[in-house]
């Protein structure tokens, strides 16, 4: 699929008496707009960003669909409510105006910057809020930096928001030379039994990720044309759950024969999707990440799902600059 990337651009450059340079860059597409801030402060080496003053003001009330703002999770219930009654929201913040136009506020090119959420400040106005570091600072940057794009998409019907390429077009170009190995797929796996309490993540008499159970799921996937199977609780360390999780990402439990499982899956035409649950312990995972991904490759596993079911240490937030940079490192290492 090819996307049309046609837009009009305007850059407004400002310089104050201290030679601080700010460029406001706008790109207007047929179905929306993106804008960002580009700063250069020549008299310093680094900058601490304490707030962002961007606001989105609606002319009058309308209907909205969103989840409450959270710097830790997206696993919240969506709410339909008047724009005027929204207290906080994660993006994308989807809305319908009184004139029947659909729209969405979101962001693009989120690199080395905290996620943006929205906060109601009155008069149908939503202010940008950035997920902070533990000390309250929103972002740490050098003396020249560019923010993420802030985006507003519009469409006559809601489906137009899904079909829009605006955010894709505002993201940086792909740096990979080949992308034919990237593909969507369906997968099933061992995890829901743990939530129901009939299986466990750690190795005991109810352990879910066993060789025998793995083969049952592989058989089911093959019979139902499902491309891959994932197993939670396959590796040592689940005994530490609830504290400072210390998983080992290259040591399967004794009842999980990874070589036999991969062999059996290949025989059935099914792939194994690896699982790295960090429990939020990012330092522990990053120490092992390169070796753990290579270990999967050496065992014939080329798919990976990471997990972050737990708070980050020392007050770091999932959607902060710290979290965004970690996820970027994971993607780049996997690629």
What are these regions (language model features)?
Residues 23, 137-140, 216-218, 260, ...:
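Generic recognition of flexible, low-complexity loop/linker segments
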Residues 1-177:
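N-terminal accessory beta-strand-rich subdomains and adjacent acidic, glycine-rich linkers
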Residues 142-224, 228:
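An acidic-aromatic substrate-binding cleft motif
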Residues 53, 83, 92-94, 218, ...:
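Short amphipathic alpha-helical segments and helix-helix/interface helices
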Residues 37, 43, 157-159, 193-196, ...:
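Solvent-exposed loop/turn segments at secondary-structure junctions
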Residues 37, 221, 307:
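Conserved, mostly hydrophobic/aromatic
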Residues 133, 176, 215, 227-237, ...:
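Intrinsically disordered, low-complexity acidic regions
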Residues 232-335:
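Aromatic- and carboxylate-enriched substrate-binding clefts and catalytic-loop regions
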């Amino acid at each position: 699929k090819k996307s049309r990337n046609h837009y009009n651009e305007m850059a407004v450059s400002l310089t104050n008496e201290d030679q601080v340079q700010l460029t406001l860059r706008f790109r207007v597409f047929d179905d929306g707009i993106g804008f960002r801030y580009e700063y250069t402060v020549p008299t310093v080496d680094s900058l601490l960003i304490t707030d962002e003053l961007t606001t989105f003001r609606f002319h009058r009330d309308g209907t909205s669909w969103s989840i409450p703002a959270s710097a830790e999770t997206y696993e919240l219930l969506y709410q339909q409510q008047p724009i005027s009654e929204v207290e906080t929201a994660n993006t994308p913040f989807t809305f319908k105006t009184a004139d029947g136009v659909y729209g969405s506020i979101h962001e693009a090119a989120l690199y080395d910057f905290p996620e943006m959420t929205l906060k109601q400040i009155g008069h149908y106005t939503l202010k940008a809020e950035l997920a902070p570091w533990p000390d309250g600072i929103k972002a740490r940057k050098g003396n020249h930096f560019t923010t993420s794009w802030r985006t507003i998409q519009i469409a006559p019907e809601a489906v137009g928001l899904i079909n829009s390429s605006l955010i894709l077009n505002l993201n940086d170009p792909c740096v990979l030379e080949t992308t034919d190995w990237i593909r969507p797929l369906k997968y099933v796996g061992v995890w829901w039994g743990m939530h129901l309490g009939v299986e466990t993540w750690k190795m005991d008499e109810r352990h879910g990720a066993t060789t025998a159970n793995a083969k049952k799921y592989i058989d089911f996937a093959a019979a139902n044309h499902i491309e891959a199977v994932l197993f939670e609780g396959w590796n040592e360390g689940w005994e530490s759950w609830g504290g400072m999780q210390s998983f080992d990402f290259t040591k399967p439990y004794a009842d999980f024969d990874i070589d036999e499982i991969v062999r059996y899956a290949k025989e059935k035409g099914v792939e194994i999707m690896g699982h790295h649950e960090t429990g939020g312990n990012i330092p522990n995972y990053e120490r092992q990440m390169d070796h753990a991904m290579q270990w999967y490759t050496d065992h014939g596993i080329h798919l990976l799902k990471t997990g972050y079911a737990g708070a980050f240490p020392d007050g770091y937030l999932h959607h902060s600059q710290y979290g965004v940079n970690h996820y970027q490192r994971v993607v780049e290492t996997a690629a």
